[in-house]
From Swiss-Prot:
Keyword tags: Aromatic hydrocarbons catabolism, Dioxygenase, NAD, Oxidoreductase
Gene: bphE
Assembly notes: Heterohexamer consisting of three BphA subunits and three BphE subunits. A ferredoxin (BphF) and a ferredoxin reductase (BphG) must be present to obtain activity.
EC supergroup of this enzyme: oxidoreductase
GO biological process: 3-phenylpropionate catabolic process
Name the UniProt record assigns to this protein: Biphenyl dioxygenase subunit beta
GO molecular function: biphenyl 2,3-dioxygenase activity
The keyword Oxidoreductase appears for this protein: yes
Organism: Paraburkholderia xenovorans (strain LB400)
Length: 188
């Protein structure tokens, strides 16, 4: 197993100063609208928010002793729950919106909650590193319930779309090391 990229296991670095209220509000509103798109199964509209160079990544998490903390998450070159590009995300969207994607037929009912949004401006104009906490509730069929909690580390760019931003990178760090869900057909 290769060593993971340092940003997977280190605490998100707080910006030296808080983002301005207007920028903070814009980004939080972006996340609320993004959650609404996903919860209303508007997957094609959500897909339009992804940059062409998107990297959508959810590493595996394992239980480690304190001295092995840097190995808690799988690395860039290791197995992952998701390691997606724009093209593979498009394939996932096509699958969940078709009649042949059995994992989502009938479709799940989801609720995305996003909070603790921390915005960090970068040296690149109109590009922001954003850390947020999430809870994703999913109900499927009659009794299947899944609850996922964790944090997302995103790179957002200002964009000429109706929400004002696009997602250039998303790293999803789940709090759980063992997933009891039947599948991971939803989007975080």
């Amino acid at each position: 197993m290769t060593n993971p990229s340092p940003h997977f296991f280190k605490t998100f670095e707080w910006p030296s100063k808080a983002a301005g209220l207007e920028l903070q509000n814009e980004i939080e509103q972006f996340y609320y609208r993004e959650a609404q798109l996903l919860d209303h199964r508007a997957y094609e509209a959500w897909f339009a928010l992804l940059d062409k160079d998107i990297h959508y990544f959810m590493p595996l998490r394992t239980n480690r002793m304190i001295r092995e903390g840097e190995l808690e998450y799988s690395g860039d070159q290791d197995l992952a729950h998701f390691d997606e590009t724009h093209e593979t995300m498009y394939g996932r969207i096509r699958k969940v919106t078709s009649d042949v994607g059995w994992a989502e037929n009938p479709p799940s009912r989801t609720r995305h909650l996003v909070s603790n949004v921390i915005v960090k401006e970068t040296a690149t104009p109109d590009t922001f590193e954003v850390n947020s906490a999430f809870i994703l509730y999913r109900n499927r069929l009659e009794r299947q319930v899944d609850i996922f909690a964790g944090e997302r580390r995103d790179v957002l760019r200002r964009a000429d779309n109706n929400l004002g931003f696009s997602i250039a990178k998303r790293t999803i760090l789940l709090d759980a090391s063992t997933l009891l869900s039947n599948n991971l057909s939803m989007f975080f």
